[in-house]
Curated annotation (Swiss-Prot):
InterPro entries: Ribosomal_bL32, Ribosomal_bL32_plant/cyanobact, Ribosomal_zn-bd
SUPFAM superfamilies recorded: Zn-binding ribosomal proteins
This protein's UniProt keywords: Chloroplast, Plastid, Ribonucleoprotein, Ribosomal protein
Gene name of this polypeptide: rpl32
Lineage, opening ranks: Eukaryota, Viridiplantae, Streptophyta, Embryophyta, Tracheophyta
Pfam family, one: Ribosomal_L32p
This protein's GO CC annotations: chloroplast; large ribosomal subunit
GO-annotated biological processes: translation
Main location: plastid
Protein name per UniProt: Large ribosomal subunit protein bL32c
Length: 57
């Protein structure tokens, strides 16, 4: 079984954790941006089927 020879330093742990958090942050920003563009109808890359409300009235 593979076992690390030495302990990982606190600074290296912090750097890796911050990189991991930053990836999650940017994924959330992109998702929010896409949701905003879909809700306003300005999205050019995401198609949403429009349903008519005439059947409900």
């Amino acid at each position: 079984m593979a076992v690390p020879k030495k302990r990982t330093s606190m600074s290296k742990k912090r750097i890796r954790r911050n990189i991991w958090k930053k990836k999650g942050y940017w994924a959330a920003v992109k998702a929010l941006s896409l949701a905003k563009s879909i809700s306003t109808g300005h999205s050019k890359s995401f198609f949403v089927r429009q349903t008519s409300n005439k059947a409900l009235e």
